Amino acid sequence: MTRRYWNINLKEMIEAGVHFGHGIKKWNPKMAPYISAKRKGTHITNLARTARFLSEACDLVFDAASQGKSFLIVGTKKRAADLVASAAIRSRCHYVNKKWFSGMLTNWSITKTRLSQFRDLRAEEKMGKFHHLPKRDAAILKRKLSTLQRYLGGIKYMTRLPDIVIVLDQQKEYIALQECAILGIPTISLVDTNCDPDLANISIPANDDTMTSIRLILNKLVFAISEGRSLYIRNR
């Protein structure tokens, strides 16, 4: 994996609040190597470690994208939903930003069936077929389509398991990380001071509660993905 410069600087991370962890009573001892201090009852993340692992993650996704690999971004916090969707669309990644359904990856055959139903319903609606149905039947199908759009809209073009999964909140997306571990899918995860850094292939110590922190980390990753995709397209 080639190392590159991703313009990751401490001042920018401090301004985004990346260094603020949880209260000292809520910490996970496994995060000790990534904590630099305690301040007013709160753990402070070592931003030098954050920069190192974020840079490694950017190198990884750049190399993967330059080879045409696929990515799935998972972040189902309500406040982060729009951020996840816009970042994923910008970098042409799949995403889940509403709810992670258990078995979404490990029961991929079922997920594929749901996606097929979703695509069929979208096609029928676009062709105006709902207009020829009784009102009650049309209303039922529209509700079903709306539900599928809400929960599967971010993966509607996903035809196979992703090559790399990016997780924005380890504790909230624990099931997603478990499924990736079972399937051997490499993962990149933000880890706050109450998380377990051993659960992902690359853990980026960072504040996973503040939108400015999440946005900064995610923007760096999707920029690297976009750069890798551009190289892949040029070399085809």
UniProtKB/Swiss-Prot annotation:
The keyword Calcium does not apply. One of its GO terms (molecular function) is structural constituent of ribosome. Coiled coil: none annotated. InterPro entries: Ribosomal_uS2, Ribosomal_uS2_bac/mit/plastid, Ribosomal_uS2_CS, Ribosomal_uS2_flav_dom_sf. Belongs to the universal ribosomal protein uS2 family. SUPFAM superfamilies: Ribosomal protein S2 (SSF52313). Its main location: plastid. It comes from Zea mays (Maize). GO terms for cellular component: chloroplast; mitochondrial small ribosomal subunit. NCBIfam families: rpsB_bact. Gene3D superfamilies: Glucose-6-phosphate isomerase like protein, domain 1, Helix hairpin bin. Keywords: Chloroplast, Plastid, Ribonucleoprotein, Ribosomal protein. The keyword Electron transport does not apply. It is found in: Plastid, Chloroplast. Pfam families: Ribosomal_S2. This is Small ribosomal subunit protein uS2c. GO terms for biological process: translation.
